[in-house]
């Protein structure tokens, strides 16, 4: 079925009359490929790059390894047809003459120099002939639907029309992306995006807010009021009543004229215009007290009462210690000595009155007066009441 490369018939001249030094056989018998540098000559041998030129006449020669007496071969690496020394028996052989152009060209040239009549119909050159880099298995019974004209009209023309229509479609998509609501706009407020589009009685589109307002109240939704002007933009305003330009709040009277805060409040409370004699150059502001002042008062009152209680106890103790003298008779002139019972009664009276006054007497102290007295047998701090005072 398959013929070896060595059994291929030699027809004398090689099928490809180009540089014969590209494919060399070494002494061992293995071929060595040497790439060619002549690119234009390679491009000229490609049949699908030829615009309207007829096929080369030497393409009709039978393919094969045309080996000469030497070890060189005439195979060119730039040839589009692979070398073939065998043929497929089921492929039909062409009966066309060798010099006729315009027939169907296949990748394998079968027989003694004849061309294959039918090839692959999907790859078409410019001059009307068909060529393919793959073996041709198409039988002569080619269906008419695979003709070149129908293929171009059904596939290529549809692709061209799609490419021509792409710019128009892109512009439409960009327009819809800029306006996500399919280009809708609320006829009342002019909104272009809303969670839900509604319609009024006339069929116009309304946004969700305007549609609900119109449905509930029966009237169109009022537009948002304009933002109030800043204080810098109101610098030219003047009170209609007192002609002042300085106020914390601008008001309007019954006629809609701007008035200052003082004149507006006076008119609202008394029903008559504010007298000009009450006009003041400076604005009197209210001194607001902090809101947590009551909590501060209760906390300070509790702390003062808590601090006063131990101080009163210490004062009462101090009165007892100052007024206590355990002697009944006065041994020194100018010094009054009070008994313990009298001192306790006086201290109770002082506590009841709430006041205690200590009035020292003027008398000279001598070193002998500071010495311990012989009449005192018991120290003063050893009494029972003194221990309570010092506790």
From Swiss-Prot:
Gene3D superfamilies: Erythroid Transcription Factor GATA-1, subunit A. GO terms for cellular component: nucleus. A zinc finger (GATA-type) spans 186-210, 239-263. Residues 53-100, 281-378 are annotated as: Disordered. SUPFAM superfamilies: Glucocorticoid receptor-like (DNA-binding domain). The lineage of its organism: Eukaryota, Metazoa, Chordata, Craniata, Vertebrata. More abundant in stomach and small intestine, lower levels in heart, lung and spleen. Very low levels in liver and ovary. Residues 66-76, 317-348 have a biased composition (Polar residues). Residues 285-294 have a biased composition (Basic residues). One of its GO terms (biological process) is negative regulation of transcription by RNA polymerase II. This is Transcription factor GATA-5.
